[in-house]
């Protein structure tokens, strides 16, 4: 999954660099520009907090305090690698692509808020599933659906406020999925590699998980 989303992200970045904003970018921008609403606009602007890197970092650190030391270490390491790596790749892509935002001269592709939101949602789902909290399909479905709505809301917020093009948001989603699933796969490989060592320690009369 990580490779598929990474390839899709690179292709979209190529299009953004070569063609600039696509026709659909202009159409979606015009739609939001003609659909401004005072109350809705206020809500959407506030919704962008779910993609704010600093707020998410503080929230994740606070959440980790409820975990055991071992889980806390893995949890914080995951998000350090995923958010840090995603942010770095995103900034490098902005410089390589060089496409401006709709309303100002800042680099726009991909949307950093969307990257952060997507990585956070994917990471929380990963740890929820691994811990068994989301072992039931209903719990998984509700959590994944809620996460998707949060990410979608962040993306809409960035377009509604004329901060990003539609393809900026799509790029952020694809990069977020690629990075988070890639880090999760690396974590799983590390666990699988350590398992034979644990089994070897269980041999020779050691007690492991029972008599």
Where are these regions (language model features)?
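Small-polar-interrupted transmembrane alpha-helices in polytopic inner-membrane proteins
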Residues: 77-97, 141-156
């Amino acid at each position: 999954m990580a490779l598929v989303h990474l390839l899709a992200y690179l292709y979209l970045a190529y299009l953004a660099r070569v063609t600039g904003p696509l026709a659909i970018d202009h159409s979606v921008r015009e739609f939001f520009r003609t659909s401004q609403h005072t109350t809705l606009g206020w809500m959407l602007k506030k919704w962008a907090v779910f993609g704010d890197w600093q707020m998410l970092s503080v929230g994740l650190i606070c959440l980790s305090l409820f975990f055991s030391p071992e889980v806390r270490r893995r949890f914080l390491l995951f998000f350090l690698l995923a958010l840090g790596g995603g942010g770095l790749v995103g900034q490098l892509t902005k410089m390589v692509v060089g496409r401006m935002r709709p309303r100002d001269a800042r680099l726009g592709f991909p949307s950093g808020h969307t990257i952060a939101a997507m990585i956070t949602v994917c990471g929380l789902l990963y740890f929820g599933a691994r811990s068994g909290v989301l072992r039931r399909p209903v719990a998984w479905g509700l959590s994944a659906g809620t996460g998707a709505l949060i990410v979608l809301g962040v993306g809409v917020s960035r377009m509604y406020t004329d901060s990003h093009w539609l393809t900026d948001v799509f790029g952020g989603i694809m990069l977020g999925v690629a990075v988070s699933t890639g880090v999760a796969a690396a974590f799983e490989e590390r666990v699988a590699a350590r398992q034979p060592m644990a089994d070897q320690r269980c041999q020779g009369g050691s007690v492991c998980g029972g008599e």
